[in-house]
C-alpha cells in the first residue's frame, strides 16, 4: 500500500514539476506562474486598446469620433464605454447583444469591457509576479503590497464606480482627453476636489514626489568621494560594493534644517512607501463612496447666505456655481439618450459661448 501511494504521488508531481521548472527558470524575462495570468491579459488589454483607438468609432455609444481613422490624434482617440442602455452587461462577443458579430460588438462598446477586465487581471498578474519573484529570491513582499495601491485606484475608478451607477457608460473611456472629461464630470457631479478622500490622495501623491526629490538630492549630496572627476558621474564608481553615502551626515544636515530628521534608513524608506500607498488607497476608498453617491463636504450655511446676500460670496459658493454650470452643459452633451433640454436662462454664459 505504501509503495502504491508513493508511485501515485510521483506520477502526480511529474507534470507539475516539469511546468514549475520551465516557468520559474532563470532567464532574461522571468515568466513564472503569475506570467500565465499577466502576459495573456496584458497582451489582450493593450491589443484591444490599440485596435479601438485606431479603427473603432464611438458614434453609436457617445455620438463621438474617437479613432485615428476618423481624424483623432493620440490625445483625443479613445476606447469608449458602452452605451448607457447596455447597463452592466459584460458585452461578451458571443453574448445576446453582439451575437458573434465582431463589427457589431465593436460598435456597441465591447472593446471597453474587454480592455477593462483584461487590464484589471493584467495588473493583478503583475502584482502576483512581484510576490512570486520576491519569494524566489527571499525578499519581503513590500513591492507587491505597494503595487496594490494603483490596482485599487484602477478597480475603483473603472469598475466599482460604474457598478454603483447605472452602467459602464459612466466609467472613464480609455483615452487622454476622455480621462480629462471624466475628471470634469467627477467635479461637476460629485464636487470631488472637496472630498476629504481626494485631499488625502493629493497629499499622498504630491507628498511622495517631495519625499522622492528630497531623498534623491540628499543621497547625491552625501555620496562618498572615490574619484577625482569634476562631476557626479565621473567622480563616483557606480559598481562599488560598500556603503555609498553617509546617513550620519544626512541626519545632521536635516536636523539643522528642520530640527528633526530620520534616524535610520528603515523608518525613512518605510515612510516613503507609506505616504503614496496610503494616499492612493484613500482616494480609491473615496471613489467607492462616489459609486454610492456619498457627498463631499457641504457648507450649506454659506450657500444660504450667498443666496440671500448678493454681496456675500466665498470660493466655495463660486465653485458650487461652477459645478452647476458643468452639470448643465455636460448632462445634455454627455447623455444624448436622455434628451435633456435646459432653458436658455439656466445655461452658463461666457465670452466663448
Curated annotation (Swiss-Prot):
It catalyses: 2 a plastoquinone + 4 hnu + 2 H2O = 2 a plastoquinol + O2. It is an enzyme of class 1 (oxidoreductase). SUPFAM superfamilies: Bacterial photosystem II reaction centre, L and M subunits (SSF81483). The modification N-acetylthreonine is found at residue 2. GO terms for cellular component: chloroplast thylakoid membrane; photosystem II. GO terms for biological process: photosynthetic electron transport in photosystem II. Keywords: Acetylation, Chlorophyll, Chloroplast, Chromophore, Electron transport, Iron, Magnesium, Membrane, Metal-binding, Oxidoreductase, Phosphoprotein, Photosynthesis, Photosystem II, Plastid, Thylakoid, Transmembrane, Transmembrane helix, Transport. Chlorophyll a PD2 binds at residue 198. Pheophytin a binds at residues 130, 143. It is a multi-pass membrane protein. It comes from the Eukaryota. Chlorophyll a ChlzD2 binds at residue 118. Its EC number is 1.10.3.9. The modification Phosphothreonine is found at residue 2. 2 of the reaction center chlorophylls (ChlD1 and ChlD2) are entirely coordinated by water. Belongs to the reaction center PufL/M/PsbA/D family. NCBIfam families: psbD (TIGR01152). This is Photosystem II D2 protein.
Amino acid at each position: 500500500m505504501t509503495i502504491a501511494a508513493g508511485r501515485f504521488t510521483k506520477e502526480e508531481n511529474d507534470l507539475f514539476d516539469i511546468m514549475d521548472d520551465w516557468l520559474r527558470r532563470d532567464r532574461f524575462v522571468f515568466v513564472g506562474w503569475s506570467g500565465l495570468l499577466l502576459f495573456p491579459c496584458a497582451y489582450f488589454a493593450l491589443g484591444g486598446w490599440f485596435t479601438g483607438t485606431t479603427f473603432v468609432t464611438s458614434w453609436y455609444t457617445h455620438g463621438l469620433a474617437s479613432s485615428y481613422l476618423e481624424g483623432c490624434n493620440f490625445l483625443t482617440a479613445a476606447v469608449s464605454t458602452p452605451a448607457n442602455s447596455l447597463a452592466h452587461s459584460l458585452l461578451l462577443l458571443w453574448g445576446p447583444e453582439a451575437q458573434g458579430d465582431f463589427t457589431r460588438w465593436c460598435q456597441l462598446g465591447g472593446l471597453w469591457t474587454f480592455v477593462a477586465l483584461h487590464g484589471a487581471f493584467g495588473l493583478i498578474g503583475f502584482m502576483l509576479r512581484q510576490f512570486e519573484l520576491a519569494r524566489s529570491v527571499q525578499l519581503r513582499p513590500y513591492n507587491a503590497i505597494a503595487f496594490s495601491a494603483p490596482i485599487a485606484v484602477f478597480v475603483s475608478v473603472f469598475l466599482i464606480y460604474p457598478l454603483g451607477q447605472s452602467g459602464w457608460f459612466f466609467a472613464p473611456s480609455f483615452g487622454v482627453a476622455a480621462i480629462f472629461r471624466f475628471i470634469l464630470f467627477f467635479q461637476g457631479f460629485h464636487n470631488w476636489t472637496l472630498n476629504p478622500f481626494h485631499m488625502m490622495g493629493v497629499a499622498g501623491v504630491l507628498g511622495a514626489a517631495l519625499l522622492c526629490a528630497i531623498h534623491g538630492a540628499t543621497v547625491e549630496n552625501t555620496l562618498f568621494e572615490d574619484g577625482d572627476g569634476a562631476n557626479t558621474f565621473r567622480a563616483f564608481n557606480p559598481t562599488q560594493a560598500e556603503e555609498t553615502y553617509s546617513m550620519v551626515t544626512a541626519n545632521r544636515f536635516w536636523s539643522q534644517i528642520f530640527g528633526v530628521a530620520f534616524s535610520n534608513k528603515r523608518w525613512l524608506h518605510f515612510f516613503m512607501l507609506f505616504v503614496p500607498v496610503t494616499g492612493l488607497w484613500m482616494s480609491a476608498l473615496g471613489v467607492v463612496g462616489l459609486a454610492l453617491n456619498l457627498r463631499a463636504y457641504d457648507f450649506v450655511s454659506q450657500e444660504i447666505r450667498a443666496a440671500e446676500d448678493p454681496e456675500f460670496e466665498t470660493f466655495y459658493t463660486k465653485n458650487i456655481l461652477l459645478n452647476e454650470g458643468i452639470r448643465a452643459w455636460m448632462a445634455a452633451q454627455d447623455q444624448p439618450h436622455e434628451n435633456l433640454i435646459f432653458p436658455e436662462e439656466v445655461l452658463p454664459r461666457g465670452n466663448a459661448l
